[in-house]
């Protein structure tokens, strides 16, 4: 899968959850990969919902979002999120702007949850840097937040 999401906004999300910890470039890269895979999966489900409703356009409601946040409040840029949404769905589908913003907000909450856990794992290991292994360890935990 081609990387659609730049690491800088993902690094920003990790840093806002890191407290005083440093963030490795590999951690941002790994989280960006996870965000992208999760976003593509959510878009497939949203496309199925739109198809069931007889539509070719994905709407915010297809992602389970009723109140779409202001796009300026999001760290993740909309253009890469749009490309992520289109990775695994058929070309016949369109993605509305509200759906893009809704997906970005979902992915940001997802990233925040993982970043918080990664910071906790780094502190537990008595390290001052969040690494890619902290991101991956989150997914190995039997009980996630």
Where are these regions (language model features)?
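Intrinsically disordered, low-complexity terminal regions
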Residues: 1-145
